[in-house]
């Protein structure tokens, strides 16, 4: 198990484990196996991963936070809380948007565009 040095990466794609509510059309078992308290567990893990991985990003680097969830608790709530706690982060609006704009990112809703639901938010670490 190799330990990575802080500020090692220019860019990171953080596709976190989630409730998979955006892919229920293809995976209907999600409706049966998910419990209400699963969302809180996923949210805690997502927050922990985001805070941990942020340390690996170089100044000037970009991190794309992504889920296959349509739940705000796993998306904007995680990013908003992170931005409130991490003063070296800000969200960036992507020039080419897919989905509906949210406070901190973009949400793709399956019933609107077809396909799977997902969320993404681009976070930037300022140069020192």
Regions found by a protein language model. Give the residues of each.
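Arginine residue identity/basic-tract feature
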Residues: 25-26, 34-36, 62, 97
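Conserved P-loop NTPase nucleotide-binding/switch module
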Residues: 21-32, 68
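C-terminal catalytic and target-recognition region of SAM-dependent MTase-like enzymes
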Residues: 1, 6-13, 17-20, 40, ...
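Glycine-rich S-adenosyl-L-methionine
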Residues: 30-58
């Amino acid at each position: 198990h190799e330990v990575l040095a802080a500020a090692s990466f220019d860019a990171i794609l953080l596709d976190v484990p989630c409730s998979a509510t955006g892919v229920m059309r293809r995976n209907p078992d999600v409706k049966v196996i998910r419990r209400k308290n699963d969302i809180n567990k996923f949210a805690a893990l997502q927050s922990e991963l985001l805070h941990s991985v942020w340390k690996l990003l170089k100044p000037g680097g970009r991190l794309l936070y992504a889920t296959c969830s349509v739940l705000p608790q796993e998306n904007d709530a995680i990013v908003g809380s992170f931005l409130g706690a991490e003063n070296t982060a800000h969200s960036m609006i992507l020039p080419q948007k897919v989905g509906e704009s949210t406070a901190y990112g973009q949400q793709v809703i399956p019933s609107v565009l077809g396909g799977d639901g997902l969320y993404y938010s681009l976070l930037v670490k300022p140069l020192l």
